[in-house]
Structure formats: C-alpha cells, structure tokens
Amino acid sequence: MYVLDTGFDALLARAWLADHASETIEVQYFIWSTDNIGILASEALLRAAERGVQVRVIVDDLTVEAPDKFLLALAKHPNVGIRIYNPKHSVGTPRHKRALNIATDFRGVNQRMHDKTFIVDGKVAITGGRNMADEYFDYNSEYNFRDRDALLVGQATKDMRATFERFWTSPLSVDVETLYAGRGLLNKNVEV
C-alpha cells in the first residue's frame, strides 16, 4: 500500500495508470464533475479506450453533472461502458419524473453508491475519499477537501474488483444508452 496524500500525487497516479493500462480500467465514483478534473479524467479514459483498453465506469446518479451529449458520446465508444447507479434523479429522467420519484419513493431514491475506486488491469487500484472533481485534487480556487487515497496491489485489488463487478451487474446499475434510448437522444448530435 502507498498513501497518496496530495491532490497532485493522486491525480498523477491515476493519469499514469490510465496511460499504462493494457487490458481494463474499471472506475466507480459518487461524484463526477465536468470541471477540470472531470474532463482530464474523461480524456485519460478515452485515450485508454482508443488504445484498445476496455473501460467501465459506474457513477451515482445523484451527482452526475455531465450533459446528456457528453455521457452518450463517451458511451458510444466501442471500448467504453458507462452505467448510472440508481438513476432516479438526473440521468435520462425527465424533471416531472424526478419530483414524482422523490415524493413517492424516498427510500428507493435515497439508495446511493458512495464507492470511489480506480482499478487498472485487475492488478493495481486506488481508493480513498476523492471524487472526480476539482475540490478533491486541490484544484479549486475557493475550497478544497483534505482527502487521502491508497494505491493498492494484491488481494485488496482483487477484492475491489469483485465489489466493482457486483455493482456493475446490479439491477440498480443501468447502462447510460438504455436510459436515453426512449427519449430520442441516443443518436441525436452524438459523435465519438
């Protein structure tokens, strides 16, 4: 185990691992912003996918900030899969349905996925308190969280990958293309 104490070290480790992945990258985050960090992370994953790496992403629905076109463009890449955990708040959900979900299914709406994992080739992983947003990597000019991550190898990585797989196959994790398929957005102005 190696502790990634600073935002710079944590970002650099993720970037290096993404650039050196040869088979798979599996990531799970509660928050994925469309700020500097979110864009850098998305670009790193897309570069890996372009090299033939299979990329799978799970993000909690409550805090996805990415526009529809952004999510769909990434998901259209043949080597990228994006699933949204418990999609009742934002992704692919019309506004009137969001309000109805909150009013009639508070328990179901409140079930969240708070994991933060970055697993490369099933051999190396990063986990900790950082979400994919500027304020978790010391990039916010007004406020930054003080978080740490751990870089892991060995059995801990295998256990994290098994947990990722359980979330990936959960009925609560829905493919982003499925969420948009019925709304006419799937092929509208989306190019990779």
Where are these regions (language model features)?
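HKD-type phospholipase D/PLD-like phosphodiesterase module
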Residues: M1-A21, I31-V192
